[in-house]
Amino acid sequence: MISRSLVMEYLTNPGALSLAAGVACGVCLGWGLRMRFGMLPKSSVRETNPDTETEASILGESGEYKMILVVRNDLKMGKGKVAAQCSHAAVSAYKQIQRRNPELLKEWEYCGQPKVVVKAPDEETLVELLTHAKVLGLTVSLIQDAGRTQIAPGSRTVLGIGPGPADLIDKVTGHLKLY
């Protein structure tokens, strides 16, 4: 058994044992977080040849990702209705990207899952944005309302674009105003 004098000495002057325990905890925590979030030291990352186009360079060079929700402004939906329709679009887009490109989804989540809501004047603009986004290879989700409350059944209410590279999404929606 440990003598009382050793316990008292440790309690008054913890010294090397506490230092060793702290360093060990820090190393384990750092290693665990690095493994969890896939961070690698710069020395282990290969440089890419600028002459070859990879999926990352095609998708976006800024390294930033976002999702845009485009709301039709001509329908004059209430705040709750807009929130519900945007939620439908966000969940639909999330499910699509989860199936089609889990790596991109991980990058978007790592960026903090940014979502921006903008407004479009009418349905025609919504369809034009959808077409442009598809041409650029972006994930899209067009929401049609069931028509049980405020608006006509089948009305196209919200277009979700992304998650995807911010620079590509800005080519489609950069001119729209915030909702």
UniProtKB/Swiss-Prot annotation:
Annotated membrane topology: Single-pass membrane protein
Kindly provide the name given to this protein in its UniProt entry.
Peptidyl-tRNA hydrolase 2, mitochondrial
User: Per its UniProt record, what Pfam families does this chain match?
Assistant: PTH2
Locations listed in the record: Mitochondrion outer membrane
Give the GO terms filed under biological process for this record: negative regulation of anoikis; positive regulation of anoikis
What this protein is reported to do is described as: Peptidyl-tRNA hydrolase which releases tRNAs from the ribosome during protein synthesis. Promotes caspase-independent apoptosis by regulating the function of two transcriptional regulators, AES and TLE1.
Bilayer-spanning residue ranges: 10-32
> What does the sequence similarity comment in the record state about its family?
Belongs to the PTH2 family.
Q: Which UniProt keywords apply?
A: Hydrolase, Isopeptide bond, Membrane, Mitochondrion, Mitochondrion outer membrane, Transmembrane, Transmembrane helix, Ubl conjugation
Explain the post-translational modification.
Ubiquitinated by PRKN during mitophagy, leading to its degradation and enhancement of mitophagy. Deubiquitinated by USP30.
Q: Where is this cross-link: Glycyl lysine isopeptide (Lys-Gly) (interchain with G-Cter in ubiquitin)?
A: 76, 81, 95, 106, 115, 171, 177
User: Is the keyword Signal assigned to this protein?
Assistant: no
Entry EC number(s): 3.1.1.29
Spell out the subunit comment.
Monomer.
Name the chemical reaction catalysed here: an N-acyl-L-alpha-aminoacyl-tRNA + H2O = an N-acyl-L-amino acid + a tRNA + H(+)
Question: Per UniProt, what is one GO molecular function of this protein?
Answer: peptidyl-tRNA hydrolase activity
Main location group = mitochondrion
Q: Which GO terms describe its cellular component?
A: cytosol; mitochondrial outer membrane
